[in-house]
Amino acid sequence: MSATPQQLNDFLRRLHLGSEVYYVGQLCDAWHMSTPGGSDATTFHLVCHGEAWIHMKDGSEPARMTAGDIAFFPHDAAHTFSAHRVIPQQPFDYSHPAPLDVHAPGSGLLCGHLRLPAHIRRLMLASFPEFMLIHPEASPVGHQMRSLIEMMTEEATRNELGVTAILDRLSDALFLYVIRHALHMEPKLSPLLATLSDDHLRPAVAAFIDAPAEAWTVERMAGLACQSRSAFSERFTQLVRMPPMEFVATWRMQLASGMLADGNANMLDIAMKCGYESEAAFRKAFKRIIGIPPGKARGN
C-alpha cells in the first residue's frame, strides 16, 4: 500500500483554514507596527509594493522585504514590521490606514492570519521555524505565487462588493503555496510529510492512511516498518513530535471533523469509520484532541 498524493490532498481539502486579512493599507514615512506574538494564530505579511523590514525580538539581523515578498510566522513569533532598517522611536498610528495605491510613494501592505486547530498545527507546522521570508522569484513555486500575489494586490486596491471575502479566500491559497514552497525546500519540515519521506516509517504510515478504520497498534505499525516496537516509537516520535498512537488518533479525529461538518452522518457510523467500536470512546477521544464535543462540531 502507499499513501497517494490524493489522500494527502483530501486531508488538506477538509481543513477549514479560516484565513482573515486584518490589514490592507498604504504607509509612508517612518511607520512601524509590532505584534507581541504568543497567540494561537499563524500570521503573514505581504509587501504589495515598496519595501519593509522585519525585526525579530531575538536581536537577529533585520530582514529586508521588497514587492511580492512574504513574511510567514507559523507560530506567531513576536516581531516588528517597519519602513526602515532602524525602528523609529516615535509612536505610529496604523489604525486608520490609507487605501492601498501601488502608484503612490511608500509601501503597500497586506497582513493576515489563520487559526488552525492545535492538532493540525502539530501535524503540519511543528517543525517550522519561527520566521520564514519568502522571495517568490527564488521559490520552486514562484510562478504560481507571483500570479496569486498579483491577484491579491489588484483586489486589495478595489472598493467593490466582496473584496474582504475574496482576499480571505485568496489568503487560504497563499498559505497552501507557502507550505508547498517550504516542503520543496525541506521535505521534513512538516511532521506529517516527514513520515512519508522516511524509508523506515513510510510503509506503516501509508498503510494506516489507507485504512484508518482498522485496528491499529504500535506493534502492528512497527511490524510494517520492519522495526522493533521501541525503535519504531522512538524514530516516529522524533520525526513527528508525537507518539504513534497520538498521531493515529489525531488523524482519525481530523477525518471525523470532516464527516461531522457534513451534518448528516450518524455518530456511531463516524466512530466506526474512525476505528472506534463504541460511540462513547469516540466522543471521549474527539473531545480530548479537538477540544469540543463532537456534537458541537457537527455542521461547523
State each model region's role.
Residues 47, 208-211, 260:
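Short helix-to-turn junction characteristic of helix-turn-helix DNA-binding domains
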Residues 62, 215, 264-265, 280:
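Residue at a beta-strand N-cap/secondary-structure junction
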Residues 1-72, 77-100:
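Generic protein-terminus/edge-of-domain signal
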Residues 28, 186-190, 240:
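Short, Lys/Arg-enriched N-terminal segment that forms or immediately precedes the first helix
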Residues 173, 177-183, 203-254, 271-296, ...:
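Basic/polar phosphate-binding segments, predominantly the helix-turn-helix DNA-binding elements
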Residues 110-119, 125, 130-206, 210:
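An amphipathic alpha-helical interaction segment
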Residues 85-109, 119-131:
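Double-stranded beta-helix
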